């Protein structure tokens, strides 16, 4: 009997290992909705965690694993802007300043308006603890205040530092900062949506079966979004704010981008697209998608409807629309690949 069971166990273990490896390999075959096409436009990006079009021919890339921020030109030639960074997750810029989110630290540089003469490194915030997660996106609100996403140090715990598991406001000039929203376990990114507000992704706890859903939330100043008290029996604790859109549990919804009016991709002026990285915390593969979320303000509330737009895309993290409306995203596995989605001609 045992000699018959042993091969079966071996096959099952092999399949489980293959399932874990597959999304990080180069063997996936991305598919996208009818009427659109997807293609790889650059490889060997490193560990890409941010994408931002500086202009129509200059793409900014954060390489977390390489500790650098660089640009790609129209021919995908690389120019390093800033190096020797500690796991840079994101950057934001104005006409005179560049803000960089590193592990537990937010820094500012000056530049000449064209991403040249980058100098005068200044530490705005430091000492934010890192652990299971780290500080992620840095964005600029319409009023000029910086919003900095700070992940939790654990899966489920009460943080010693209130700056973990939170969204922070930061004064871009002085570095003074505080808690803008709490109870946010690990928010990778957010985006301002006109007529809606600032929306942000959040990755929920692991090891709780089909709880909780991946979330898209609407920022309310001073709001609490439930973690770590949001257990399966009480998913939206009293006094906390529930999500405006959800997706498959444990699939890690991360980067988010607002669809521009000139985009050929489906949606309206309050549609966002998000990356779904996928998870090791499931038996069968889930995630590895690009999803579309249509936001509809109704009677003072905002409701989001989520649907799949692209599948089997590997491990996508950052996402951005080109000025011409095409959609770009990068996968973190396979040493970093850049994809473009556009309408079929």
What label would you give each PLM region?
Residues 1-23:
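Secretory targeting signatures
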Residues 29-53:
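Mature N-terminal segment immediately following signal peptide/propeptide cleavage
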Residues 37-43, 77-83, 122-128, 175-181, ...:
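A short beta-strand motif characteristic of beta-propeller blades
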Residues 54, 62, 101-103, 149-151, ...:
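Residue-level marker for isolated small/hydroxyl-bearing positions within beta-strands
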Residues 59-75:
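Beta-propeller domains
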